[in-house]
Amino acid sequence: MKTTCNLRTRRAILSLAAAMAILPLGASAAEAQLLNVSYDVARELYKEINPAFIAEWKKNTGETITINQSHGGSSKQARSVADGLEASVVTMNQANDIDMLADRGVVAAGWAKKFPHNAAPFYSTMIFLVRKGNPKQIKTWDDLAKPGTKVVIPNPKTAGNGRYTYLAAWGSVIKKGGTEAQARELVARIFKNVPVLDGGGRAATTTFTQRDIGDALVTFESEVQMVRSEFGGNFEVVYPAVSILAESPVAVVDKVVDKRGVRKQATAYLNFLYSDAGQTIGAKHFLRPRSETVAKKFAGNYKPIALFTVDEVFGGWKQAQKKHFDDGGEFDKIYQVK
C-alpha cells in the first residue's frame, strides 16, 4: 500500500510540474482583458490603437493585456451594452449614447468629466463623397434635396453618423437665419432622396462604393478621407460651407471594470487616446486631434470648415434626441411621410 501511495504521489507531483512548465515564465492565471465596444467606422482606428497601447502597457508595467473590439451602429452598440454586453470601455461617436448608459447606471453620471475635452479625444464633421466628376454638382446641403439626386445616409435611429447628418442638414438652415419649418422641409426633401437606410456607417459606405447606389454619401470626414485614400480617383470629396462638430466621446463601463478588476487598465487605455502616440494614430485615420502639436503636423489632412455644435443649435443631445429621434419624433414623422 505504501508503495502504491508513493507512486501516486510522485505521479501527481510530476503532472503538476509538467503543467507548470507549459505556462510561460511569469504568466498570470488571469491575464487582463478589455472589450472596447465602439461605433461602426472605427474598426481600423482601434486595430492600430490597440497594439500600440498593449506594447506601452507591457513596457511600463510588465503586464500582458488583451483588447477585443466590437463594432456596429453607435446607438445599437450602446443598447447592447445597456442590455448586458460586458464592455470594459465604450468609444462612441455621440454623447447621447453614453448619456443613455449613464441613465441606466452602467457608466458614471459624471462620465464626461472623467477625461479631457468632455471625454472626447477626437472629433470630426459630416461631409460628402460624390462620384468622379461630381455629375450631379453636389456642393451644398440644399443640393442633396434636389429631385433625382440619390443620397446614401445610415439610419439615424441606429447610427450616430445618421443622426449627425440629419442634425447637420437641419442646422445648416438655422445657421443662415432660416426657420424651424424651413429646416424641417429641407431635411424631409433630403430623406425623400435616400434609397436605403443602412444600419451603420460602414454598411452605408459599402452601399455607395461597392453596390454603386447613390450620387452622394454623407458620413464622417474620417470615413470619407479613408474611402478616397483607398479607392483613389473613383470619388471626390466635397466640403459644404457649414457642418456640425461631431465628437467621439469615451467612457469606462464602471460595473464591468469593477467586476473584472480591470479599472486601472481600462482608464489607462482611454488616457492613451490623449497621448501624442494616440493622437497621432487618430490623425493618421483622419480624425481631428485635440493636441495642437499633432494637429499642426497633420494640418494638410483637414480643410477649414465652419462648425456648429449640438448644444448651440439644438440645446444639447438630450433635447435633440427627444425632439428628433425618439419614437414619434421629427425623424419618424418625416420618414413616414416618405
What are these regions (language model features)?
Residues K176-A241:
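Ligand-binding pocket segment of bilobal, Venus flytrap-like solute-binding proteins
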Residues L25-E31:
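Sec/Tat signal peptide C-region and signal peptidase I cleavage site
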Residues V37-Y39, V130-K132, K150-K176, I190-V194, ...:
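Short beta-strand->loop
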Residues K2-L14, A19:
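Twin-arginine (Tat) signal peptide motif
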Residues E31-A159, A306, Y335-K338:
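N-terminal segment of the mature folded domain
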Residues T125-N134, E247-K264, I281-H285:
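A bilobed periplasmic-binding-protein/Venus flytrap-type ligand-binding module shared by bacterial periplasmic
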Residues G133-K139, T158, G171-T179, V256-K264:
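Short helix-loop capping/hinge motifs at secondary-structure junctions, enriched
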Residues V257-K338:
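Extracellular/periplasmic juxtamembrane helices and adjacent flexible linkers that interface
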